[in-house]
Amino acid sequence: MSATMAEYQSSTSRRYDTQIHRRVTRTVNVGGVLIGSDHPVRVQSMINEDTLDVEGATAGIRRLHEAGCEIVRLTVPSLGHAKAVGEICQRLRETYQPVPLVADVHHNGMKIALEVANHVDKVRINPGLFVFDKADPDRTEFSGEEIASIRERIAENFEPLVTRLKQQDKALRIGVNHGSLAERMLFAYGDTPLGMVESAMEFVRICDSLDFHNIVISMKASRAPVMLAAYRLMADTMDQEGFNYPLHLGVTEAGDGDYGRIKSTAGIATLLAEGLGDTIRVSLTEAPEKEIPVCYSILQSIGLRKTMVEYISCPSCGRTLFNLEEVVQKVRDSTSHLVGLDIAVMGCIVNGPGEMADADYGYVGKGPGVISLYRGRDEIRKVSESEGVDALIQLIKDDGRWVDPP
């Protein structure tokens, strides 16, 4: 038997809720950009220039920031690179503006992290590589004493970085990668989401012991199912232990083209819809600035941020009274610079008015060569198809919702 409306409305389950209820997370400040559940889901990316190329890296950061990237990461594999970051920050101040920067530090990066922490707003470390020991092919197990010794060495090397970040009120990302778990984690947990979570929690607990909480956590994998499981388990584990750190979402090494975008969306949007995630990156094998529109499209498609026009259009059928694809493109070309509007382009009046009822404006086929313009649910006027796009623009202008393109 179908549920009654009263039963539906009284249900406490969020499974049927049209709103996304974000997991409550603390606020982390990254160069003035606030990450956490009280703030918009943030968009990040990473330059692909060599950090030693100060001018090239500065230009890459600027391109990303101008494209809408809110936090930019750059690789710092050596002390020389760490010092170059200071020059990059200076060049940004001189030629553009300060941009929130994250330094990516990997293999045995203790000294590198301490140096670059003086320049950037956040340091990202990989728990599997921060204190790195080459895998021993002859090893069959780790003794309890060996594990304790490794943990002691990790704490000894990690604490100075935590102390510096705390003193400077800067942030840390504990960024686990599925493909680079430490050997002892692989022995203990296998190549699993649990191993990823335990890798992160080891560092989280050290931070907690030092009363440092300006932390963001990521659980990246190149396969979406692994990434999904790891983030869910990480959130559950933090909840059980009383931690509420923000999550940085991403499918690493997603590839390029349509499939890379689809693969990233499958992982990122799924978690966002579950309320997990406070900042995202879509990793594509393309120019970094091409990642940014994908991020904003994901966020808009599930209602977390609105930064562009939302276009609603039917797939076309035998009832369509004009070239729908051509008209949609004309409308998009004329209005894509606007922010916050919903515009529907529907091929006929059979389903058009109902399916576009939530739109701010509608363009609907009325008859051969004739279209109707709508404001919300109200039909405003009929015009010839040749005048349709211009008349739609005029209607938006009449309502005071038009701005000229930049």
UniProtKB/Swiss-Prot annotation:
Residues that hold [4Fe-4S] cluster according to the record: C314, C317, C348, E355
Keywords recorded for this protein, A-Z: 4Fe-4S, Iron, Iron-sulfur, Isoprene biosynthesis, Metal-binding, Oxidoreductase
Catalytic activity: (2E)-4-hydroxy-3-methylbut-2-enyl diphosphate + 2 oxidized [2Fe-2S]-[ferredoxin] + H2O = 2-C-methyl-D-erythritol 2,4-cyclic diphosphate + 2 reduced [2Fe-2S]-[ferredoxin] + H(+)
Top-level taxon of the source organism: Bacteria
Pfam families from the UniProt entry: GcpE (PF04551)
Essential cofactor(s): [4Fe-4S] cluster
Documented EC number(s): 1.17.7.1
GO molecular function terms attached to this record: 4 iron, 4 sulfur cluster binding; 4-hydroxy-3-methylbut-2-en-1-yl diphosphate synthase activity (ferredoxin); iron ion binding
GO BP annotations listed: isopentenyl diphosphate biosynthetic process, methylerythritol 4-phosphate pathway; terpenoid biosynthetic process
Family per record: Belongs to the IspG family.
The protein's role, per its UniProt record: Converts 2C-methyl-D-erythritol 2,4-cyclodiphosphate (ME-2,4cPP) into 1-hydroxy-2-methyl-2-(E)-butenyl 4-diphosphate.
Protein name: 4-hydroxy-3-methylbut-2-en-1-yl diphosphate synthase (ferredoxin)
Species of provenance: Prochlorococcus marinus (strain MIT 9313)
Lineage, broadest ranks: Bacteria, Bacillati, Cyanobacteriota, Cyanophyceae, Synechococcales
Recorded name of the encoding gene: ispG
